[in-house]
């Protein structure tokens, strides 16, 4: 992976796609823990932590917030592989916030309008 090229594309386009960043066992570990979290933890969460396109249809789960309540995801945000990639692309030190998960189930009609993440984060300086 050429991080200089990724950084140049990020600077030019404002985003990058990193293909095959997680593969094999690393991917399986995350996939299995997301499935476990959805199955075992989500039913215990209070309001505002899990969002569905249609509340009565679990397969329409579209967003999870506050995932640091789970030890796997709390520890995972310190994964050096992610941090090193972010720092290489952004060109500055990064601090991983609380893990969140976003999904667009097939045939989802919910659109995410343009927005500024720092409206919620309130970082100063606003490096998000």
Spans of model-derived segments:
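Non-heme Fe(II)-dependent double-stranded beta-helix
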Residues: 1-13, 19-123
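Surface loops at the rim/top face of extracytoplasmic beta-rich domains
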Residues: 127-128
